[in-house]
Amino acid sequence: MPARPMHMINSSGQSRPWIGANFWSRTGGPRMWSRYDPGIVREELRVLHEHGLTMTRSFFYWPDFMPAPDTIDEGACDRYRDFLDAHREVGMGTIPTFIVGHMSGENWDPSWRHGRDLYTDVWMVARQAWYITELTRRFHDHPAVIGWLISNEIPIYGGEGDEKIISAWALLMVGAVRAGGGLQPVSLGDGAWGVETTGHDSGFSSLTYGELVDFIGPHVYRMENDRVRQHLKAAFVCELAQVAGKPVIMEEFGLSSDFVSARGSASYYRQLLHSTLTAGASGWVAWNNTDFDDLREQRPYSHHPFEMHFGITDAAGAPKPPLEELRIFSEELSGTDLAGLRRAPTATGIIVPSCLTARSPFTTEEERAL
């Protein structure tokens, strides 16, 4: 029978699931580091912790943290260090994300990029590696840091590319984390949007870069009215992502309450959490921690208003139904030896046609689409 692996992430010497949220404070969204309020951040983390969440994914907004090619903003670093301390105070961890150029429907360049290619411009690659090493050096020994992500959805920021070039870039970026002293698990943050899971050849192949990273992190948002696909596509992607032989972490998932009722949002979370567990996922990081109603005039929310309402808490910090589902799920897992679980063998399997990985000539995008 086909093997059905369930790999666990290992962080701080313990095999345990990550259950958390992607985090921007409601005081600023992507601009939180220039509008940082330590009291509100602690309040936001307290609510998450009280509902069973153990971690967040956090973001170094690139224009703020690297205002010049050879400069790290130490004020932003001081605020991030306080952010780490706030996690430690409530017993939570966080996964910092380095190259945050794309966020919620808009791309944000540092002023000095001037259109340089992130993967092939040697100077630009060196600047990214320096930036990652410098930030890692500052924070790698903080006990709240439990992992690292190179980017946020970089295929829609840096663009797609040749698989060999993308994988060489990934090798250098992961190497920059290790050069800075980071020993925690690391991955790319690319969304696992490669040909293996989508049928579209973006150049980000988990089969190729999988040997460089410690986990694969799908980002799954279903934007359609097919209920079966809505509820099961994330699990399908998790099954396909197992091909890399690494732990699969649901790095981003969620939905805007602009599009669904409170009851429907709870049902979606419940279905996704349990179906991806049975599909081999061993970590879940919801998008995102809060709504942003007070930022309606700020980009990207001014032009993508539905992005304001993916929160698992509202703009005042009150829990929404998805957070209650995360609490229940966390309680269920706390009474389970997740690391000791084995998925039941099955005589069924997913047949992945060779055209997805062989790049056969005269095959079209339509033929590969999943």
Can you annotate each of these PLM segments?
Residues 24, 189, 251, 351-353:
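Short hydrophobic segments within beta-strands
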Residues 278-370:
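Carbohydrate-binding surfaces of carbohydrate-active enzymes
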Residues 58, 217-218, 350:
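Redox-cofactor binding/interface segments in oxidoreductases and associated redox assembly factors
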Residues 2-213, 284, 293-294:
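Active-site mouth of glycoside hydrolases
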Residues 1-7, 27-42, 186, 215-235, ...:
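N-terminal-biased segments
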Residues 155-279, 307-321:
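Extracellular glycoside hydrolase catalytic/binding regions
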Residues 32-33, 106-107, 228, 261, ...:
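Short, solvent-exposed loop/turn and secondary-structure capping segments
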